[in-house]
């Protein structure tokens, strides 16, 4: 199956909500169906993203403005080197985290999530055609994170997850597709697949 116009899909949610697994699983499902698709993550695996991952692992410290600037720079590279080339080669792009994550995660007393989102929009970053938000209570998300073997990142505490979830609620667009993160993973993938297929039919 080949769609005439590829679409840009973004997955958002707090750590432990299942969005990374969903992004990967849905991409695999689309490829199985013969629908050209590519999955990417932010922070990227580019140099700009590696720098950010050092911060997330607590290996380096960055001030609030430095954090935001680093995320914006990585996003520019993400679009330039990953997202736009894939879309231009007729592949649908599925992205794990985007500008809404930066707005939710980097917000605080000095910078609101709305202000950070505006900084992203002022850069004219591409708006996604579909935005999925996996909603899950912070306590359940933290339980999932605690079961993982890899080391924790700096935002993986109950207080931080609650703050981030609250920030998401302030900046998610009205057309965001909310998915219940408590559902079975296969159910979630199927639900998102049906929404995706309906969307590409309407754009073809």
Swiss-Prot record:
Show the catalytic activity. dTMP + ATP = dTDP + ADP
Q: What is this enzyme's EC?
A: 2.7.4.9
Q: Where does ATP bind?
A: 13-20
List the record's Gene Ontology CC terms alphabetically: cytoplasm; cytosol
**What are the recorded Gene Ontology BP terms?**
dTDP biosynthetic process; dTTP biosynthetic process; dUDP biosynthetic process
UniProt KW keywords? ATP-binding, Kinase, Nucleotide biosynthesis, Nucleotide-binding, Transferase
| UniProt entry tagged with the keyword Kinase | yes
Q: Which GO terms describe its molecular function?
A: ATP binding; dTMP kinase activity
What top-level branch of life does the organism fall under?
Answer: Bacteria
Protein's job: Phosphorylation of dTMP to form dTDP in both de novo and salvage pathways of dTTP synthesis.
Family as reported in the entry's similarity comment: Belongs to the thymidylate kinase family.
Check the record and name the PANTHER family matching this protein. Answer: THYMIDYLATE KINASE (PTHR10344), UMP-CMP KINASE 2, MITOCHONDRIAL (PTHR10344:SF4)
**Protein name (record):** Thymidylate kinase
């Amino acid at each position: 199956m080949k769609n005439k116009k590829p679409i840009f899909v973004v997955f958002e949610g707090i750590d432990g909500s299942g969005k990374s697994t969903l992004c990967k699983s849905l991409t695999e499902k689309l490829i199985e169906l013969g629908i050209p698709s590519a999955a990417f993550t932010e922070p990227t695996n580019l140099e700009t993203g590696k720098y950010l991952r050092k911060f997330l692992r607590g290996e380096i410290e960055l001030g609030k403005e430095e954090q935001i600037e680093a995320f914006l720079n990585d996003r520019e590279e993400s679009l330039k080197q990953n997202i736009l080339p894939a879309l231009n080669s007729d592949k649908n792009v599925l992205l794990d985290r985007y500008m809404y994550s930066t707005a939710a995660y980097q917000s605080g007393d000095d910078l609101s999530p709305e202000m950070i989102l505006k900084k992203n929009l002022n850069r004219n970053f591409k708006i996604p055609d579909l935005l999925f938000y996996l909603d899950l209570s912070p306590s359940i998300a933290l339980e999932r994170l605690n079961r993982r073997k890899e080391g924790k990142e700096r935002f993986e505490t109950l207080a931080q997850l609650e703050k981030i979830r609250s920030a998401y609620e302030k900046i998610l667009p009205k057309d965001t597709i909310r998915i219940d993160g408590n559902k079975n993973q296969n159910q979630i993938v199927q639900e998102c697949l049906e929404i995706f297929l309906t969307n590409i039919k309407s754009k073809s």
